[in-house]
Amino acid sequence: MSSKAPKKSKQRSQPRNRTPNTSVKTVAIPFAKTQIIKTVNPPPKPARGILHTQLVMSVVGSVQMRTNNGKSNQRFRLNPSNPALFPTLAYEAANYDMYRLKKLTLRYVPLVTVQNSGRVAMIWDPDSQDSAPQSRQEISAYSRSVSTAVYEKCSLTIPADNQWRFVADNTTVDRKLVDFGQLLFVTHSGSDGIETGDIFLDCEVEFKGPQPTASIVQKTVIDLGGTLTSFEGPSYLMPPDAFITSSSFGLFVDVAGTYLLTLVVTCSTTGSVTVGGNSTLVGDGRAAYGSSNYIASIVFTSSGVLSTTPSVQFSGSSGVSRVQMNICRCKQGNTFILG
């Protein structure tokens, strides 16, 4: 007896489960590597403290009342960036953001005997933008002042407030916020033109906040009919220190030192530069004229003593309309030697 084969199911066979032919790989993309550099300056304590004595000026006597030897009223602003008051500290201050004055004492040292007449006064004004005193009565009205005969030594201690202030590195700041006032020196009842004594400043100053060195070159411009405008650097020159006419230009340098001066005069014809007054030419100057511009570079030394003759003068030209200058301190070795 034969057996029947089993009937096939009418249901369609199910397809086999297959694993998708896809693989996932982790690929390391070679990114550029860098380093994070952190600067922690300055440390919590002040980075730099300096105790120094500076010669501020040589006092020249006068019959009538005169302030700062006839220089600008705000010439002696109390800020370490001021080269007239801090001739050496100004370069240290250029490396920092802030300063703090801890000690300030003015000393007058006479150079004349009792046979000389006249008086000298030293004043501290907390506002660096105030005008100079106009009478002898106003001298005693200041919070800190001292007056003496020209042959008698004296000193004035200024109270330091230990407040941090910004070092001024240009002329676009509010002077009341960055200066610790100003110093004023008044002479009267004496003889004109006689050097009576020296004024020294004993100071202790601290700096903090190291920064890239600020400009130590002053850039100035004066246009015909205008006043001297400073754009950069320390105040070797102030607006009253320069004059301009259609045929000449003059400069009075009342901060003692040796300077490198480069000037560009816009004019119709050529001229010449001379050094005189309180200054002396060092070495040889170089000059050239072309395309309505007279360009000169000189090295000279100024004694800082008041003079009615310009320290540097450009003359013999015509059509002078603008003078641009760069001036900075230098050494006598920076001069040019012809030949």
Curated annotation (Swiss-Prot):
The keyword Ubl conjugation does not apply. Keywords: Capsid protein, RNA-binding, T=3 icosahedral capsid protein, Virion. Residues 1-15 have a biased composition (Basic residues). GO terms for cellular component: T=3 icosahedral viral capsid. Residues 1-46 are annotated as: R domain, interaction with RNA. Residues 47-207 are annotated as: S domain, virion shell. Residues 1-24 are annotated as: Disordered. It comes from the Viruses. It is found in: Virion. Residues 208-339 are annotated as: P domain, projecting. One of its GO terms (molecular function) is structural molecule activity. Capsid protein self-assembles to form an icosahedral capsid with a T=3 symmetry, about 31-34 nm in diameter, and consisting of 180 capsid proteins. Plays an essential role in virion formation by interacting, via its N-terminal region, with the bipartite viral RNA genome and specifically with the 3' terminus of RNA-1 and the TA element on RNA-2. Also participates in symptom development, viral RNA accumulation and systemic movement within the host. The N-terminal R domain is rich in basic residues and is essential for RNA-binding and virion assembly functions. Belongs to the icosahedral plant coat protein family. Homomultimer. This is Capsid protein.
